[in-house]
UniProtKB/Swiss-Prot annotation:
Serine/threonine-protein kinase that may function as a signaling receptor of extracellular matrix component. Binding to pectin may have significance in the control of cell expansion, morphogenesis and development. Strictly expressed in siliques. Disulfide bonds join 236-250, 244-261, 263-277, 283-300, 294-309, 311-324. This is Wall-associated receptor kinase 4. The modification Phosphothreonine is found at residues 399, 569, 574. Residues 1-22 form the signal peptide. It comes from Arabidopsis thaliana (Mouse-ear cress). The active site is at residue 535. The lineage of its organism: Eukaryota, Viridiplantae, Streptophyta, Embryophyta, Tracheophyta.
């Protein structure tokens, strides 16, 4: 007996769970493929509403069908979604009928929903849908055009594509397409010269003139179409509420005689089942549509078909807002109002003070940034950039905050190097790109002019062997320049310093010399305004990961007007690389860079520093060192043993002679950088005969020594030299290394 009772309880529980799902009758399939069925629909015997065969579906190969139309969705909200194929007509090249088909359907007790449109594709065509097969009771649209326009993509406006709403209520329909009679000039929708007509749910078709729609000729391809369904033959007045399940509501159908059911508010499920509408627990559901709206001063209590908010002690429910409020104690209410009003007033005052302070701080910061901008030469930069001719560089203005973040607050661990014109930091921008940030020395106003000059010069340069300027920041106490990051240090580091590389072959060094010479030739001759670098040295030549040379540090550079060959300036440069003629006269020209390049070329050949006080007195300067070695025919003694071999001796000798020619005492005797670049390039790619002289007069050698000896002698006892030349003070940075 107990076993029988347990069995009955189990059956009751299973039946109740099945009804809670609100989908189908017990023991009936709930799905066909991916489509979920709901009563009154079904496809197994006894699973659909027996009084109406329209609810009898068929499931074939996991696909659900209704009267030959594939069903993709069923809803107990009285709608069925099916796939309806397109009708079409195709014409041959003479405009004659080639093939085509159209479709008609008897929907039984189901009717076409008003949420569909009739659509036509193709020029000079029209489509219609009829409820009885005759055109006089049809709804359609016309598509007229001479040729398809891609400008109409995305919308059916009557040009190549048209659409028209379809009224609800039809249960027997035919869909057809036609072409205007005697029109053979039609530009078709695709290569097949076909026109199409089809029903489609609103918003489910997007027109594109470039698409090929020939796939619509496949009977198994269709567009979603919405059908309305109801229980036919009786109205709610005739059947009463008993025909809908418990907690269900009956509504008359809008299309013909019939009715539909829906669950009352607070219930959900299938209203066509006796116990299909189940209570919604608003207190626990995660569905935001049904979830309760009780305030934090109350707790939610679920009721059948609704819920109730229970207020805490000393609170009562406001039925208008469904929120809890303090109970009507005048003293309590007054005290609460006073505290609340005082708190709000205090917060408003604090907020106002905070806003005023924030605004004042922003104003002060803006004024300070503007002050720094002017102090750092921002106005001068804008004026010079506007008057310097066309710019090849898009100079980006960085913010002070951005520079702090990029350098981690100018952390010492980010310092890449320090020189006469400031400190260089490694920076990381928000996009994770690595840059080099050059910061002028604090309190050195002379650096401002050099920074502005560097921006001005680099704005005129667009060359692969020049370090690229990305932008600047002038709203800080000292100006900042932002460059591309070159990862492998300087040429000085590789030849003499911490990054000394014994594998720096002759091919590497010759290529670097060609790149540096080509860059200087570009600056002198090909830039929009001729540029003299004025501080060429191995410490200002950067190398990337491929050992490609990049000329850097244009702080001392000068733009030379087109109508001038020389420019009188304060003498500036690095001892060991400084042109003796420029040092003595104060007149700067492109031959000054030629001299400095000759010194760099000698360093590449010998691996020796430009100035070395460990060498003999007469050879402290590398120019004297080379001159004496050339004169005494012992050049092989000073060439770096890492580069010379029996296969490249002639090339190295030619390169050495080029270096000596570049360092002649007077500029007139030196070649131009174009000639130097051409000769070095010839050494690199061919074995052509060298055009430089093979012998050097003894008098010229003496001139080399005399000019260099003066610089060396003056530089042995002082870190800086004061020289009164044409009433200008010359300041020379003595940097044997950097």
């Amino acid at each position: 007996m107990k076993v029988q009772r347990l069995f009955l309880v189990a059956i009751f529980c299973l039946s109740y769970m099945q009804l809670v799902k609100g989908q189908t009758l017990p023991r009936c399939p709930e799905k066909c493929g991916n489509v979920t069925l709901e009563y009154p629909f079904g496809f197994s015997p006894g699973c659909w509403r027996a009084e109406d065969p329209s609810f009898n579906l068929s499931c074939v190969n996991e696909n659900l069908f209704y009267k030959g139309l594939e069903v993709v969705e069923i809803s107990h909200s009285s709608q069925l979604r099916v796939l309806y194929p397109a009708s079409y007509i195709c014409y041959n090249s003479k405009g004659k009928f080639a093939k085509g088909t159209y479709y008609w359907s008897n929907l039984g007790n189901l009717t076409l929903s008003g949420n569909n449109t009739i659509t036509a594709l193709g020029c000079n065509s029209y489509a219609f849908v009829s409820s009885n097969g005759t055109r006089r009771n049809s709804v359609g649209c016309i598509s007229a055009c001479d040729a398809l326009s891609h400008e109409a993509n995305g919308e059916c406006n009557g040009e190549g594509c048209c659409q028209n709403p379809v009224p609800a209520g039809n249960n027997w329909l035919i869909v057809r397409s036609y072409r205007f009679d005697n029109d053979t000039s039609v530009q078709p929708i695709s290569e097949g010269q076909c026109i199409y007509a089809f029903l489609v749910e609103n918003g489910k078709f997007k027109y594109n003139a470039s698409d090929k729609y020939s796939y619509l000729q496949n009977r198994n391809v269709g567009f979603p179409v919405v059908l309305d369904w109801s229980i036919r033959g009786e109205t709610c007045g005739q059947v009463g509420e008993k025909k809908c399940g418990v907690n269900g509501i009956c509504s008359n159908s809008a299309s013909g005689i019939g009715y539909t059911c829906k669950c009352k508010g607070g219930f959900q499920g299938n209203p066509y089942l006796q116990n299909g509408c189940q209570d919604i627990n608003e207190c626990t559901t995660a569905n935001p549509i049904h979830k309760h709206n009780c305030s934090g001063d109350s707790t939610c209590e679920n009721k059948l078909g609704h819920f109730r908010c229970n207020c805490r002690s000393r609170y009562e429910l406001n039925t208008t807002t469904n929120t809890c409020k303090p109970k009507g104690n005048p003293e309590y209410v007054e005290w609460t109002t006073i505290v609340l009003g005082t708190t709000i007033g205090f917060l408003v005052i604090l907020l106002a003070i905070s806003c005023i302070e924030h605004k004042m701080k922003n104003t002060k910061d803006t004024e300070l940034r503007q002050q720094f901008f002017e102090q750092n030469g921002g106005g001068m930069l804008m004026q010079r950039l506007s008057g310097a001719g066309p710019s090849n560089v898009d100079v980006k203005i960085f913010t002070e905050e951005g520079m702090k973040e990029a350098t981690d607050g100018y952390d010492e661990n980010r310092i890449l190097g320090q020189g006469g014109q400031g400190t260089v930091y490694k920076g990381i921008l928000p996009d994770n790109s690595i840059v080099a940030i050059k910061k002028a020395r604090l309190g050195d106003n002379s650096q401002v002019e050099q920074f502005i000059n560097e921006v001005l010069v680099l704005s005129q340069i667009n060359h692969r062997n020049v370090v690229k300027l990305l932008g600047c920041c002038l709203e800080t106490e000292v100006p900042l320049l932002v460059y591309e990051f070159i990862s492998s240090g300087t040429l000085f580091d590789h030849l003499h310093g911490s990054m000394f590389d014994s594998s720096l072959t002759w091919e590497h060094r010759l290529r670097m010399a060609v790149e540096i010479a080509g860059t200087l030739a570009y600056l002198h001759s090909s830039a929009s305004i001729p540029i003299i670098h004025r501080d060429i040295k191995t410490a200002n030549i950067l190398l990337d990961e491929n050992l490609t040379a990049k000329v850097a540090d244009f702080g001392a550079s000068r733009l030379i007007p087109m109508d001038k060959e020389d420019l009188a300036t304060m003498v500036q440069g690095t001892l060991g690389y400084l042109d003796p003629e420029y040092y003595n006269t104060g007149l700067l020209n492109e031959k000054s860079d030629v001299y400095s390049f000759g010194v760099v070329l000698m360093e590449l050949l010998s691996g020796q520093k430009a100035l070395c006080f460990e060498r003999p007195q007469t050879s402290k300067h590398i120019v004297s060192y080379f001159a004496s070695a050339t004169k005494e025919n012992r050049l092989h003694e000073i060439i770096d043993g890492q580069v010379m071999n029996e296969n490249n001796q002639r090339e190295i000798q030619k390169a050495a002679r080029i270096a000596v020619e570049c360092t002649r005492l007077t500029g007139e005797e030196r070649p131009g950088m174009k000639e130097v670049a051409a000769e070095l390039e010839a050494l690199r790619v061919t074995k052509t005969k060298h055009k430089w002289s093979d012998e050097y007069p003894e008098q010229e050698d003496t001139e080399h020594l005399v000019g260099v000896q003066k610089l060396s002698a003056q530089g042995e006892t002082s870190s800086s030299i004061g020289y009164d030349s044409i009433r200008n003070v010359a300041i020379l940075d003595i940097e044997a290394g950097r």
